[in-house]
Regions:
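FAD-binding core/adjacent interface of flavoenzyme oxidoreductases
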Residues: 1-12, 78-166
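Beta1-alpha1 glycine-rich phosphate/pyrophosphate-binding loop at the start
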Residues: 2-82, 86, 160, 165-166
Length: 169
């Protein structure tokens, strides 16, 4: 692998994304003789498998989020930048994020996935995704508001409709 770093310096690895793949990549390189920068737009890692419990009020958002800096605290070769990646300049080998430039010799793009509406974007207001803490708290708010409205409804059919939920996926 050809490295563009200056003579005598360590290879620069930039990991974009602080989800499972990005964090595991960073941790796997803990003992490597490199300078690693992990960039994410959030300063926390969200444990997505438990987001449904945040949405249903069984857990608080703090129970499924851990500061990325804390996770990588003991890793001497790593630093964390909270920034939103705007572009990758392939010619200069730099990631451009929040008006800063992060030079790299090796780039790992681990930005995760998003939900899809399969050509039906009009479903989005009625079928929110569940990938972020904000998604979970929005779903929680919608559920609690539906119960509040159902409690005030006099018509049993309206009450039934307000307390009927469909989960897809």
């Amino acid at each position: 692998m050809a490295m563009a770093q200056q003579a005598g310096s360590r290879p620069r690895v930039v990991v974009v994304g602080g989800g499972f793949a990005g964090l595991e990549t960073a941790k796997a390189l803990a003992k490597a003789p490199i300078d690693l920068t992990l960039i994410d737009r959030q300063n926390h890692h969200c444990f997505q498998p438990l987001l449904y419990q945040v949405a249903t009020a069984a857990l608080s958002p703090a129970d499924v989020a851990w500061p990325i800096r804390s996770i990588l605290r003991g890793q001497a070769n790593a630093r964390v930048a909270m920034a939103e990646v705007e572009a990758v300049d392939l010619d200069s080998r730099e990631v451009i994020a929040s008006e800063r430039r992060f030079p790299y010799d090796v780039l790992v793009v681990a930005t995760g996935a998003t939900h899809a509406y399969f050509g039906h974007d009009d479903w989005a207001p009625f079928a929110p995704g569940l990938k972020r803490i904000e998604d979970a708290t929005d779903i929680r708010r919608r559920i609690l508001m539906a119960f509040e409205r159902a409690e005030l409804a006099e018509d049993p059919a309206v009450r039934q409709a307000l307390t009927t939920f469909v989960i897809v996926g």
